[in-house]
Curated annotation (Swiss-Prot):
NCBIfam families, alphabetized: inosine/xanthosine triphosphatase
Protein name: Probable inosine/xanthosine triphosphatase
Keyword Hydrolase (UniProt): yes
Functional summary from the UniProt entry: Phosphatase that hydrolyzes non-canonical purine nucleotides such as XTP and ITP to their respective diphosphate derivatives. Probably excludes non-canonical purines from DNA/RNA precursor pool, thus preventing their incorporation into DNA/RNA and avoiding chromosomal lesions.
GO BP term, pick one: nucleotide metabolic process
Record field: catalytic activity: XTP + H2O = XDP + phosphate + H(+); ITP + H2O = IDP + phosphate + H(+)
């Protein structure tokens, strides 16, 4: 199956490939540019989810022979009086169905929080602080914070896996599409 992904980030592309493979689905991943209307640092759960959905629909519209369009969006949400970075994946299909999934979330480091809430991308702040180039295309800030135990790939893959759950044939009776 051809799967269009609204990103050129290798972490996201590999995560989509791996998530589909986990369920025995053969996916030919086709990267496309993300929509220009997306904010650099989405804040709020609805904004993050909307960004993932917009990416998924845009990818599907660009690649005419794709069965699925996938959007992966990382952003910040508030819970329990804290701010968390979360990854959300959305999968759109030709029937207009969109499924979503969340990856694990981690607390945004306090030293970055004010800038993040002003719209500065967490990855940019992490690159400056840790002196690493293109951190979001590599291990991500989570990779640095966990000393490589968890990577951005892991967060992306988990979100895509969760978005695939309603699409598994064994789960068809459980969902109304």
């Amino acid at each position: 199956m051809i799967v269009a992904v609204a990103s050129r980030n290798p972490n996201k592309l590999r995560a989509v490939q791996a998530a589909y493979k986990l369920f025995g689905m053969r996916a030919q991943v086709v990267p496309v540019e993300k929509p220009v209307s997306l904010p650099p640092q989405p804040i709020g759960v609805e904004t993050v989810v909307a960004g993932a959905i917009e990416r998924a629909r845009a990818a599907l519209s660009v690649v005419q022979n794709a069965e699925h369009g996938v959007g992966i969006e990382a952003g910040v949400l508030q819970a329990g009086g804290r701010y968390l970075d979360v990854t959300v994946a959305a999968i759109a299909d030709r029937n207009g169905v969109v499924t979503i999934g969340f990856g694990p979330a981690f607390q945004v480091p306090d030293i970055f929080l004010n800038d993040v809430l002003r719209g500065v991308e967490l990855g940019v702040l992490a690159e400056r602080y840790f002196g690493r180039v293109a951190i979001g295309y590599k291990e991500g800030i989570i990779g640095v914070l966990t000393k490589g135990v968890v990577s951005r790939f892991d967060l992306n893959m988990a979100a895509v896996v969760m978005a695939l759950v309603p699409r598994l044939s064994t789960n068809a009776p459980l969902y109304r599409f």
